[in-house]
Amino acid sequence: MGKIIGIDLGTTNSCVAVMDGDKPRVLENAEGARTTPSIIAYTDKETLVGQPAKRQAITNPKNTLFAIKRLIGRRFTDNEVQRDIEIMPFEIAKADNGDAWVNVKGDKLAPPQISAEVLKKMKKTAEDFLGEPVTEAVITVPAYFNDAQRQATKDAGRIAGLEVKRIINEPTAAALAYGLDSKKENQIIAVYDLGGGTFDISIIEIDNFDGEQTFEVRATNGDTHLGGEDFDNRVINYLVEEFQKEQGVDLRNDPMAMQRVKEAAEKAKIELSSAQETEVNLPYITADATGPKHLNIKVTRAKLEALVEDLVSRSLEPLKTALADAGLSVSEINDVILVGGQTRMPLVQKKVADFFGKEPRKDVNPDEAVAIGAAVQGGVLAGDVTDVLLLDVTPLSLGIETMGGVMTSLIEKNTTIPTKKSQVFSTAEDNQSAVTIHVLQGERKRAADNKSLGQFNLEGINPAPRGMPQIEVTFDIDANGIINVSAKDKNTGKEQQIKIQASSGLSDEEVEQMVRDAEANAESDRQFEELVQTRNQADSIAHATRKQISEAGDALTAEDKAKIETALAELETAAKGEDKAEIEAKIEAVIKASEPLMQAAQAKAQTNQAGEQQSSAKDDSVVDAEFEEVKENK
């Protein structure tokens, strides 16, 4: 069995590692670097990846692709994609299935197809080191990646010729890397992962017992559209605006000039992590009728921090949510680990230290920790590492739409995966022959406020009164966080299932918005839930009353029946509205109008009871006739 390599497929940079004996080793690429820029360039003759692609970007901006991870598993209509369209020099296009793809030299390319080029380079780097073919890998993704994005990442691996043995979350992988060198018995760590395009926070408990380590994720949260690229864009916009003020020329219309500004902005941002001031000097950036123009702008660390302070602050809200979900206070966190190149920024380190009340660890390499952890997990799957157990979680609740437009959760957020959960549901109408299983992901009570992952029908249900058929719905989340849903009629044994497809995943903004909305709208959610319960009560009463009318037959006068029917019609109209009090009033009206129905039912019951007693008395006399003393009286 060959080695299972670990790959950190990053937005800005990627990294590959492998177990070398009992230690993970980060591998150097063909250019001698331990990380590879996640940049792909398509020229007339070849496809370039990494540093060679980056070097020619200025002369080939429309066919040099970067930050493709921000598009993977996304719909073209997502707000984040629309924002990226405005700032990316290459053309983002709408695919036939509605996904966001990229136009390159007249061809539409899917993000997994493009990302596969980076994975191929990682694969080749590992093969050069090991001297043998590599066919299996563990690939990391942001913890807050949804099902669509995880599926798309697996697709990228497959396109690159790799069997993806496991998709694991980046903060969890970093915790594995940290745990290798930590021999403390029990500890709880926070992994703050601010990469090139995504942000994650995970609270992880590490237990050392009898030589074995267990890594259990207690909670995770994040913002999958927040990262170093956003910091770069703030600097780019500042430089472009300052140049326009000075020279009266807008560089945004010149892709080649913008590529130079982008590289200079990234370089300035990095330099300001160690220096208080830097100078961006780009001679001959453009020209007009008066001659060539040169860009020369000084940027201070204070200016940079002012430009990005709100981005850093945005990362603190998920920290609070993750701690609350884990049921922990800041004081219970033993260590804070920083992952991702953007965490080298002093302002980020200060904000994190202020939040946790302790300095983050500096002994974990933020660029390499994730790949190292992926290699460790590869070792676990290959059987080379036997003393490590990893327990990860699903970041959002999963469930189905039930009567009244409510989302009924089967698996709550932060549930350890892999996991499987079943629940029995039934029909909402008499003689219903089919049910639609509508799969949802999110935290809101109202089904429409969550994201639809897909739906399917279970047909061939035997005719029966509503509430009688038993439909068992099962959610199965594998260790990659990928979802399968099935529905089975327990009476007939008929079953249908759906594997959630990549094209139906959530947008990252929707994921974040769901959690924020759930917290901000707890009261409106409660009111909606009460409204639905009242509607369902109205429906049940209407159904039961009509059944009783049918059973009462001639025992109910035409006048009483008309009153009840009028009250029922008013109740059904009210139940379609949003006024809970109105529905409750109409329920009371039906109950009042149904009093003659109750009396008729009671009278009928008494008549039946009297008949039974009379029949019983006759039976008794027949029995007595068999006794000898009765015969003597004759």
Swiss-Prot record:
Keyword S-adenosyl-L-methionine: no
Keywords: ATP-binding, Chaperone, Nucleotide-binding, Phosphoprotein, Stress response
InterPro entries recorded: ATPase_NBD (IPR043129), Chaperone_DnaK (IPR012725), Heat_shock_70_CS (IPR018181), HSP70_C_sf (IPR029048), HSP70_peptide-bd_sf (IPR029047), Hsp_70_fam (IPR013126)
MF (Gene Ontology): ATP binding; ATP-dependent protein folding chaperone; unfolded protein binding
Region of interest (Disordered), ranges: 599-634
Compositional bias segments (type: Low complexity): 599-610
Induction: By stress conditions e.g. heat shock.
PANTHER family, sorted: HEAT SHOCK PROTEIN 70KDA
Stored NCBIfam families: PRK00290.1, PRK05183.1, prok_dnaK
Function in brief: Acts as a chaperone.
Protein name as annotated: Chaperone protein DnaK
Gene name of the encoded protein: dnaK
